[in-house]
């Protein structure tokens, strides 16, 4: 045992002599082979990469203790730019020479125990070269511990002090130590990096915890040979990887920069190293030192030799290339010029300025790009120009704005910026001063965000704020506070507190705007010191004495700091006790909005907000829009790690619907940071009053003594602070306020003066008009570097890796404008006279924009660049060349536009990703390789599989398939990676050949998503989008395009083509021969079908079964249309029977032409007009007819199935006439042939239907029909054709029967229609919903809508025929405005019956049991009273009201273009509007839009095509009832519509559920009609509605949707039926209702009164004293209304209305009438005079009620009937009134506000406070106010006390005795009994106004008194 221990001890002692620490012995030279490689690119194979490789030999010599010399020689450099990994490095001789020149001089470094110390090098060694040395020495940095094999430490390196983990393995036999160390370059105490351009963004810590956009790690492997004396590194390998992704690092895709190093020992020689005889300076440590990369832009590389000459050349080139047009490379050229300006000095600037400053185009570019250079030299140059006054104020403002926001806050820049602000910002509050200070504050913000001190710039603003406060200069105070908000430093809090209410003695006296700005200034400070800001804002919010608006803004700032749950619960508790609904509603809506956020940094807060909302919902969930609210929309995509949030909040004042302040803010989450790109705030107050009253100074107060005399009689009356009319706004970008402005009353009045006043008083207007007459030619360009974001980190090789984003743009506006004004303006010309002048305006303008966005990742130095570059370019060019003639008096506008003669690109967007290498010594060899190339795809992906037996035909099939794949746009579908190499190309053109132009959109895309379907790979590649105008060439050229608009009486004179509609009767003769041929073919087919009927039975049955299984809905409108075209005999025979009786109605229903016509006849005639144009295009061949019949028969099964639901009702009708049998769809039978016959009859009927099919149509049915058509037998087709022929003949013969049969038929049709329509509409709510689930749906979902039009009409029997016609249409719920309403009704019946729900039959049966009276009334209005009876073409009876002609003027003078004419006919109960668009050429294409507005109903249609018959969309809006509540329904239906509309609507429908969910709608899936949209709204309360929206496939509903105005709901649910509503006042009534929402009414009667805020009180009024009912409570009152009883016994009152222009008294006379005096003159005294008006005051009588209107004074009206007084004030008086009627602010807690702004403790005390006392009792009022002593001595704080009232109490005058008393509650202030003052001293004391209330007690107050003798 002892021997073992001894051996261990000896071994341990021996090992202590071993040296693991690498070292370099003195007088030894260690030679290594060194290789470093850098790669930049995408990690996937097959894509392009760039790289750099450097090979060399490195000699390290020991030249002293702990001092070594390193020398690099034999350098060989190579570049890589090609497909990875197949390409290879290519040697670069010039790069080798450049590196050899930089690394030829050796350097010294300290080295001890594996640690590199200071580096010493001559000054001739560049920073870039020294960094390469650092890359090699970084390998030598080792921290080895002998006794540990695995450990982690913080180790210094080239990238900083980072977390490093070691793993050591020892091979004792070979005396080798294997060392592996790994560095986490994201976990560094002192990380070496430079980040610029992101100072205005905030890091999202939660986002960075979830996802790292940038990761970097390095792994080192060493082999160390050790002996007892030394250890030598024999081999070292380093691999460092930098990974970057803009999206999620796992699912988003990555770009990498990979660095590798190899160091291998060759030999060790004992020799003395040769040290160069140069002076070595300490040049820092191992950590990387930034050098040329800070000045070198990564987007280009070029040599700078003669910078001044190069600036001149680049500037001249930029001006010349952008003079005519703006090329796409203009931003790149501007960026190169800016790079040169950064490299230049002040002498260069001065030389260039002298040469070009006098030339406007050059001067503009210099003033744009010099500030963007963002150096202290450019700032100094600009400051000198300001000192010499060589720049205008506008030029100074824009240069300072750009320069200070673009500059980095170095010490030199801060010094120059401080001088500019102190010396050159004017003292006046001009725009320039605001820009200077706000921009300097933003620069100070960046300085404070850096490690450097910012105390100097902070001191500038603190002193400025103190001086502004001392001078009470409000504008300067606002500017100082906004500047402190931009700085956002916690040191400014104590200075901001001076302006906050509750923190400084005089702060409460400052204007409200100052308080608002001070609170908002804390917002940016809260980002740095959230705890301090939370404490301040929470205290402000909890202080109810502070204005509600300030408290709400404090809450906004508080929630921006993301407080925790405890603070939020304090907030919730305060809101539950909050007296102000404005504040409570605002906080609740804000918390609810935040609770829905999905952003990572708000998840904790969102959870807490949801808890808070649960506590607040029961109380505040139904608050209306009259209260302040916050609206917020946000989304965050996890796979992109990006999000967007938009917040909008409104602050209302006094419950007005018009907000006082509105703020909109946009927030983004990207790259792990949060930014607020834009924030806009607008505030306005008093504008309503100013616009109503006009401009009038506040002189009314001085000239009317009555107000002052009256107000003296109130106790301690205090006026409300008057808000001067103003409008203000501000703009913030990235949290920094750029500009703010404020328009006061005088400014707004000056703006109005510009319009209404003569221009001789405003010289600028006169100069502008003169310039326009002579012609103005201007060219303006603006070059901007909008964004420069850079992140630079070192790599282990010594080269810097940069990730950067550049966004530059050049904008150009050029134009010439000349105006000819007739008659020529005189010297006293006003702008309003332009309305009576003729103006000819000739303008040629162009707007061009070129934008260039570049993203770079890779290596960037001034010697070499290698990396990935993604370039996105946007080019837009909008030319405008118009000659316009405007004749306002004649209501005529004429414009001429030149034709399109060459292709013009409007916008081009392109994006491409390159692998780029550039070498400063060999710029010609620069290489930009697209990252994605076709040859980059591996060969195996290009190969196709060829079978041994494959033939040429299969090759052709494969080729065709590949072409189809590319053309279909699926070339990059996942799972077909080989197609990814082929570009996706799509081109779409909209051809307007009429005007010789077409608009084309071309898209091209090829990306790398076929390799990996992630966002980054979708972006990599090449994408292009181009929108252009192309000429359409024709035989005759177009000279110009002319647009003429003529309104008024001269509109018909501008018509080029007379609008007429072709009568189908005129087409009959031309098509008669065609019809005979078709009839003969059908007869032949009929005979064949009869012979084969039995054999075709089975086939027809199987086909119908197949059709049923392959279609989801019973019918298709597309198939209906084809059936109508393929069965011409239907039109033939029906036309032959009624052609002579028919009259053509292009805008109406032909069925209404005669009341004696039968329903079937009308239906047939109607179908003629709708299908005539289509029938003419039918094929003559029998195969065509057979095919059409065959396609229509595929619906046989669905027809049979639908007919079963109406079997009982249709069987009786089928016996009477075949027409009604067709409408009933026949009765199903057991045989297939009869079933097919019923189907064909339904198909025939549907072919006549051109209206709106319902959900029974399947979109995919057409393809099924086409497939089935190929397999059907000819015998089956013949059978169907024969049956069709027979049914048609039967229908025709039936329609020519006697009138009695026709009458019965019409009656049956009418009843059947009523049943089906009612069944259809009643069943929509529950369609496709099982019975057991119906009960779980909301009630509103199941309610029936009942139109109110029938009820309205029943009370208006004497109205016009058009009104009665609409009654019938409204009650049937059919869109009878169609030109073929009969066929529509039949189709609606079919659609209704086709739904196989038993509820339909039940509801139809229920509707058939209506009262006989109802049916009789319906039938009474049926004949000749359709809604569309008078909707014939209005152009036949009235001229057009407006004509618009767009004409292409041809050289042969032929008409080409379009003409639109509008017709309007209106009366008291109906408005009929029609718009017809026709081609100027003689074609039958037309577009028709018509609308009818009736009481309680409006209807509109849009139709276009041949004679307006091909396509149609119709809408019907109706008022009615749902569950006996007022309801409105909007129904939109459509027939055949173009495919692009279908595709667009289908695409939009995908977003409907998501949008509905965000808006709060609930969803229920239903098979709603496929061609119908219904919106229903039912008023559930005066403030809320229930809404149901039915769209195809889904039903949405919302219960309790709040509306921003009170709905006019009467006591009876049908009150609207008797109101005198006309077509003209229906919509204005709704607008008036919204406008009147802000008007308030107060009512005062005997002992009751109801305030403006609808609070009712009952308390005693004084018997003989006047009491203030309502008054304007501002500093300068505009009205005061008082009232008092005439005598003690009477209930009658007298009213005094005092305004600033008149005193009006209304008092009762002996005969119970009312006497009115105005300014002591009797008015309305004569029996014949019922109205008096003077000085904007109107007085009139309505029966016994006197009404006074003074809107200019704020009084909408005052109604008084002798007992009840009603006062209605204008909307702009909200929150500005006082008196018994309250303050009119919609707040319930402050109704009992006394004149001194204290809340009364009781109603009686409140009323008594507004009593007007008199000095003597001769006037009848015998009361006075006295302070009283409490008749007991309460114990306060343990002491017996004497108490005196804080407010006076009404008592009788001296020598008067009270007759009647009442009890009032009064507050008392108490003194200790021993030291109490007397009552007399208390009355004289001034302390009582601010004394606290210790107790509240009830005391007696006198109401009425009796007096003896003189009283006082």
Swiss-Prot record:
Compositional bias of kind Basic and acidic residues: 1259-1269, 1306-1316
Residue stretches of biased makeup (Low complexity): 1092-1124, 1150-1235, 1273-1299, 1357-1381
Tissue: Produced by the liver, secreted into the blood and then sequestered by receptor mediated endocytosis into growing oocytes, where it is generally cleaved, giving rise to the respective yolk components.
GO molecular function: lipid transporter activity; nutrient reservoir activity
Residues making up the signal peptide according to the UniProt record: 1-15
Glycan attachment sites: 163, 991, 1206, 1375, 1662, 1698, 1703
Region spans: Disordered: 948-972, 1080-1329, 1351-1432
Post-translational modification as stated in the protein's UniProt record: Phosvitin, an egg yolk storage protein, is one of the most highly phosphorylated (10%) proteins in nature. Cathepsin D is responsible for intraoocytic processing of vitellogenin.
Gene3D superfamilies reported in the protein's UniProt record: Lipovitellin, beta-sheet shell regions, chain A, Lipovitellin-phosvitin complex, chain A, domain 4, Lipovitellin. Chain A, domain 3, Vitellinogen, beta-sheet shell domain, Vitellinogen, superhelical
Biased composition (Basic residues): 1397-1409
Induction pattern: By steroids (estrogen).
Disulfide bonds: 1642-1781, 1665-1817
Polar residues: compositionally biased ranges: 1319-1328
Alphabetically ordered keywords of this record: Allergen, Disulfide bond, Glycoprotein, Phosphoprotein, Signal, Storage protein
SMART domains membership: DUF1943 (SM01169), DUF1944 (SM01170), LPD_N (SM00638), VWD (SM00216)
Pfam families noted in UniProt: Vit_b-sht_shell, Vit_open_b-sht, Vitellogenin_N, VWD
Positions of the VWFD domain: 1640-1818
GO biological process: cellular response to estrogen stimulus; response to estradiol
Residue ranges annotated for the Vitellogenin domain, each copy included: 24-663
InterPro entries: Lipid_transp_b-sht_shell, Lipovitellin_superhlx_dom, Vitellinogen_b-sht_N, Vitellinogen_b-sht_shell, Vitellinogen_b-sht_shell_sf, Vitellinogen_open_b-sht, Vitellinogen_open_b-sht_sub1, Vitellogenin/Apolipophorin
Function: Precursor of the egg-yolk proteins that are sources of nutrients during early development of oviparous organisms. Phosvitin is believed to be of importance in sequestering calcium, iron and other cations for the developing embryo.
Protein name in UniProt: Vitellogenin-1
Biological source species: Gallus gallus
Organism placement in taxonomy: Eukaryota, Metazoa, Chordata, Craniata, Vertebrata
């Amino acid at each position: 045992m002892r021997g073992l221990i001894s051996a261990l001890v000896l071994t341990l002692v021996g090992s202590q002599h071993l040296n693991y620490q690498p070292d370099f012995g003195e007088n030894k030279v260690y030679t290594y082979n060194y290789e470093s490689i850098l790669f930049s690119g995408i990690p996937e194979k097959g894509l392009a990469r760039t790289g750099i490789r450097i090979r060399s030999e490195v000699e390290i010599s020991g030249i002293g203790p702990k001092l070594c010399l390193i020398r690099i020689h034999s350098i060989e450099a190579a570049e890589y730019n090609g497909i990875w990994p197949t390409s290879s490095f290519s040697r670069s001789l010039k790069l080798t020479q450049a590196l050899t020149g930089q690394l030829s001089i050796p350097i010294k470094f300290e080295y001890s125990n594996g640690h590199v110390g200071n580096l010493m090098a001559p000054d001739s060694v560049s920073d870039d070269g020294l960094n390469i040395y650092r890359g090699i020495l970084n390998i030598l940095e080792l921290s080895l511990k002998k006794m540990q094999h695995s450990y982690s430490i913080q180790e210094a390196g080239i990238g900083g002090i980072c977390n490093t983990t070691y793993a050591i393995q020892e091979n004792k036999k070979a005396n080798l130590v294997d060392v592996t160390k790994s560095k986490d370059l994201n976990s560094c105490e002192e990380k070496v990096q430079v980040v610029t351009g992101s100072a205005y963004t905030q890091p999202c810590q939660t986002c960075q915890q979830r996802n790292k956009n940038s990761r970097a790690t390095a792994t080192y492997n060493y082999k160390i040979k050790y002996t007892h004396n030394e250890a030598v590194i024999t081999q070292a390998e380093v691999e460092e990887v930098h990974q970057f992704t803009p999206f999620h690092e796992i699912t988003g895709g990555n770009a990498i920069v990979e660095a590798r190093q190899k160091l291998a020992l060759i030999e060790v020689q004992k020799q003395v190293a040769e040290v160069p005889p140069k002076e070595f300076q300490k040049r820092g440590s191992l950590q990387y030192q930034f050098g040329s990369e800070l000045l070198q832009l990564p987007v280009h590389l070029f040599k700078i030799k003669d910078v001044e000459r190069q600036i001149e050349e680049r500037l001249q080139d930029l001006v010349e290339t952008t003079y005519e047009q703006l090329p796409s490379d203009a931003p790149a050229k501007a960026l190169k010029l800016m790079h040169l300006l950064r490299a230049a000095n002040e002498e260069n600037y001065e030389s260039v300025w002298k040469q070009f400053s006098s030339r406007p185009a050059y001067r503009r570019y210099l003033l744009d790009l010099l500030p963007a250079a963002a150096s202290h030299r450019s700032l100094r140059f600009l400051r000198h120009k300001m000192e010499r006054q060589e720049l205008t104020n506008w030029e100074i403002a824009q240069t300072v704005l750009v320069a200070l926001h673009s500059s980095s806050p170095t010490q030199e820049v801060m010094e120059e910026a401080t001088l500019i602000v102190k010396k050159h910002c004017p003292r006046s509050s001009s725009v320039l001063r605001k820009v200077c200070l706000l921009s300097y504050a933003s620069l100070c913000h960046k300085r404070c965000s850096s490690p450097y001190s910012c105390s100097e710039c902070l001191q500038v603003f603190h002193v400025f704020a103190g001086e502004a406060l001392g001078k009470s200069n409000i504008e300067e105070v606002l500017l100082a506070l906004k500047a402190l908000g931009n700085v956002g430093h916690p040191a400014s809090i104590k200075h901001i507190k001076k302006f906050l209410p509750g923190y400084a003695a005089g702060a409460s006296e400052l204007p409200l705007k100052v308080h608002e700005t001070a609170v908002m200034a804390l917002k940016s400070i809260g980002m740095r010191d959230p705890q301090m800001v939370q404490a301040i804002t929470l205290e402000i919010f909890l202080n109810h004495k502070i204005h509600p608006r300030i408290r709400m803004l404090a809450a906004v700032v508080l929630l921006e700091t993301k407080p925790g749950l405890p603070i939020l619960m304090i907030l919730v508790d305060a809101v539950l006790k909050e007296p102000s609904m404005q504040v409570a509603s605002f906080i609740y809506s804000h918390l609810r909005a935040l609770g829905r956020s999905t952003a990572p940094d708000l998840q904790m807060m969102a959870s807490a907000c949801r808890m808070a909302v649960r506590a607040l919902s029961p109380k505040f969930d139904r608050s209306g829009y009259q209260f302040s609210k916050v609206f917020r929309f946000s989304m965050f995509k996890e796979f992109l790690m990006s999000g967007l949030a938009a917040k909008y909040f409104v602050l209302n004042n006094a419950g007005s619907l018009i907000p006082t302040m509105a703020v909109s803010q946009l927030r983004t989450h990207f790259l792990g940071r949060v930014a607020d790109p834009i924030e806009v705030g607008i505030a306005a107050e008093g504008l309503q009053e100013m616009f109503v009253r006009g401009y009038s100074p506040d002189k009314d107060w001085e000239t009317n003594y009555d107000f002052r005399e009256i107000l003296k009689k109130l106790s301690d009356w205090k006026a409300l602070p008057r808000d001067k009319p103003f409008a203000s706004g501000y703009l913030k970008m990235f949290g920094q306020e750029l500009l703010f402005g404020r328009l006061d009353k005088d400014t707004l009045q000056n703006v109005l003066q510009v319009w209404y006043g003569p221009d001789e008083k405003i010289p600028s207007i006169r100069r502008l008009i003169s310039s326009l007459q002579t012609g103005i030619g201007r060219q303006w360009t603006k070059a901007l570097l909008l964004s420069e974001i850079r992140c630079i980190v070192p790599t282990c090789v010594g080269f810097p890796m940069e990730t950067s984003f550049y966004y530059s743009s050049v904008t150009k506006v050029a134009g010439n404008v000349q105006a000819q004004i007739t008659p020529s303006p005189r010297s006293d010309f006003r702008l309003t006279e332009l309305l009576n002048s003729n103006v000819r305006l000739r303008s040629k303008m162009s707007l061009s924009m070129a934008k260039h966005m570049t993203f770079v990742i890779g290596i960037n130095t001034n010697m070499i660049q290698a990396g990935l570059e993604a370039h996105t370019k946007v080019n837009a060019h909008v030319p405008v060349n118009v000659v316009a003639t405007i004749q306002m008096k004649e209501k005529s506008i004429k414009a001429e536009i030149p034709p399109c003669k060459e292709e013009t690109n409007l916008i081009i967007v392109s994006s491409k990703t390159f692998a780029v290498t550039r070498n400063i010594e060999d710029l010609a060899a620069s290489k930009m390789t697209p990252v994605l190339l076709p040859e980059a795809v591996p060969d195996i992906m290009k190969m196709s599989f060829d079978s041994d037996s494959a033939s040429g035909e299969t090759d052709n099939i494969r080729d065709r398939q590949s072409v189809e794949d590319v053309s279909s746009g699926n070339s990059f579908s996942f799972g077909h990676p080989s197609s990814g190499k082929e570009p996706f190309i799509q081109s779409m053109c909209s051809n307007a050949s009429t005007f010789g132009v077409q608009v084309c959109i071309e898209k091209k895309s090829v990306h790398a998503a076929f390799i990996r379907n992630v966002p980054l790979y979708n972006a990599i590649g090449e994408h292009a989008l181009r929108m252009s105008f192309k000429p359409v060439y024709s035989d005759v050229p177009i000279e110009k395009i002319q647009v003429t608009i003529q309104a008024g009486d001269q509109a018909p004179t501008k018509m080029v083509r007379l609008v007429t509609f072709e009568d189908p009767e005129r087409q009959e003769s031309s098509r008669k021969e065609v019809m005979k041929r078709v009839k003969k073919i059908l007869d032949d087919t009929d005979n064949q079908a009869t012979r084969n009927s039995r054999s075709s039975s089975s086939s027809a049955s199987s086909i119908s079964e197949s059709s049923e299984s392959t279609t989801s809905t019973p019918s298709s409108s597309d198939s209906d249309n084809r059936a109508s075209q393929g069965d011409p005999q239907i039109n033939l025979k029906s036309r032959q029977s009624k052609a002579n009786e028919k009259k053509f109605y292009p805008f109406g229903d032909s069925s209404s032409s005669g009341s004696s016509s039968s329903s079937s006849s009308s239906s047939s005639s109607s179908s003629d007009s709708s299908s005539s144009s289509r029938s003419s295009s039918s094929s003559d061949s029998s195969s065509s007819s057979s095919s059409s019949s065959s396609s229509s028969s595929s619906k046989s099964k669905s027809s049979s199935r639908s007919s079963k639901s109406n079997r009982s009702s249709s069987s009786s009708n089928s016996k009477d006439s075949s027409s009604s049998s067709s409408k009933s769809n026949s009765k199903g039978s057991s045989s297939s042939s009869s079933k097919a016959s019923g189907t064909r009859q339904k198909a025939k009927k549907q072919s006549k239907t051109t209206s709106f099919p319902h959900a029974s149509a399947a979109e995919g049915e057409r393809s099924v029909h086409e497939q089935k058509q190929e397999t059907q037998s000819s015998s089956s087709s013949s059978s169907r054709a024969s049956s069709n022929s027979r049914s048609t003949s039967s229908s025709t013969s039936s329609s020519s029967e006697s009138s009695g049969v026709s009458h019965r038929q019409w009656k049956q049709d009418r009843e059947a229609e009523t049943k089906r329509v009612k069944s259809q509409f009643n069943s929509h709510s529950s369609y496709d919903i099982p019975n057991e689930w119906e009960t779980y749906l909301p009630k509103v979902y199941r309610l029936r809508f009942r139109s109110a039009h029938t009820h309205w009409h029943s009370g208006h029997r004497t109205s016009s025929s058009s009104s009665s016609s609409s009654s019938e249409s409204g009650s049937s719920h059919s869109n009878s405005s169609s030109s073929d309403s009969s066929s529509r009704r039949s189709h609606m019946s079919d659609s209704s019956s086709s739904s196989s729900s038993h509820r339909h039959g039940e509801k139809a049966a229920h509707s058939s049991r209506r009262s006989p009276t109802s049916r009789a009334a319906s039938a009474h209005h049926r004949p000749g009273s359709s809604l569309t009876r008078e909707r014939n073409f209005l152009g036949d009876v009235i001229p057009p009201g407006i004509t618009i002609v767009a004409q292409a003027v041809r050289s042969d003078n032929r008409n080409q273009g379009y003409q639109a004419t509008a017709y309007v006919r209106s009366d008291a109960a109906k408005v009929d509007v029609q718009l017809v668009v026709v081609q100027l050429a003689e074609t039958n294409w037309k577009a028709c839009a018509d609308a009818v507005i009736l009481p309680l109903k409006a209807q509109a249609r849009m139709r276009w095509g041949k004679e307006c018959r091909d396509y149609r969309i119709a809408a019907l809006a109706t008022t009615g009832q749902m569950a006996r509540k007022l309801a409105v329904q909007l129904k939109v239906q459509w027939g055949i519509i173009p495919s692009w509309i279908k595709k667009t609507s289908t695409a939009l429908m995908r977003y409907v559920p998501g949008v509905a969910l965000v808006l709060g709608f609930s969803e229920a899936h239903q098979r709603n009609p496929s061609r119908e949209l219904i919106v229903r709204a039912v008023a559930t309360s005066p403030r809320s509605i229930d809404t149901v929206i039915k769209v195809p496939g889904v039903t949405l509903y919302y219960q309790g949707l709040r509306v921003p105005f009170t709905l006019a709901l009467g006591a009876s649910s049908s009150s609207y039926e008797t109101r005198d509503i006309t077509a003209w006042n229906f919509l204005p009534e709704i607008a008036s209702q919204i406008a009147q929402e802000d008007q308030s009414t107060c009512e005062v009667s005997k002992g009751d009164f109801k305030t403006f805020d609808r609070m009712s009180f009952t308390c005693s009024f004084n018997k003989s004293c006047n009491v203030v009912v309502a008054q304007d409570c501002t500093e300068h009152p505009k009205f005061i209304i008082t009232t008092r009883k005439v005598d003690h016994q009477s209930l009658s009152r007298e009213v005094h209305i005092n305004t600033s222009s008149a005193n009006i008294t209304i008092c009762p006379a002996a005969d119970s009438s009312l006497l009115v005096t105005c300014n002591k003159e009797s008015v309305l005294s004569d029996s014949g005079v019922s109205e008096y008006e003077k000085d904007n005051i109107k007085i009139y009588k309505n029966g016994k009620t006197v009404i006074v209107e003074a809107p200019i004074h704020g009084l909408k009206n005052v109604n008084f009937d002798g007992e009840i007084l009603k006062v209605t004030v204008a909307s702009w008086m909200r929150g500005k009134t006082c008196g018994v009627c309250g303050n009119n602010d919609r707040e319930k807690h402050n109704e009992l506000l006394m004149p001194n702004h204290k809340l009364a403790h009781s109603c009686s005390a409140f009323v008594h406070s507004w009593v007007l006392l008199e000095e003597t009792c001769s006037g009848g009022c015998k009361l006075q106010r006295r302070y009283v002593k409490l008749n007991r001595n309460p114990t306060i704080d343990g002491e017996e006390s004497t108490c005196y009232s804080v407010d006076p109490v009404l008592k009788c005058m001296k020598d008067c005795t009270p007759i009647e008393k009442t009890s009032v509650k009064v507050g008392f202030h108490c003194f200790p009994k021993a030291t109490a003052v007397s009552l007399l001293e208390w009355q004289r004391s001034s302390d009582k106004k601010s004394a606290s209330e210790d107790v509240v007690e009830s005391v007696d107050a006198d109401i009425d008194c009796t007096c003896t003798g003189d009283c006082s």
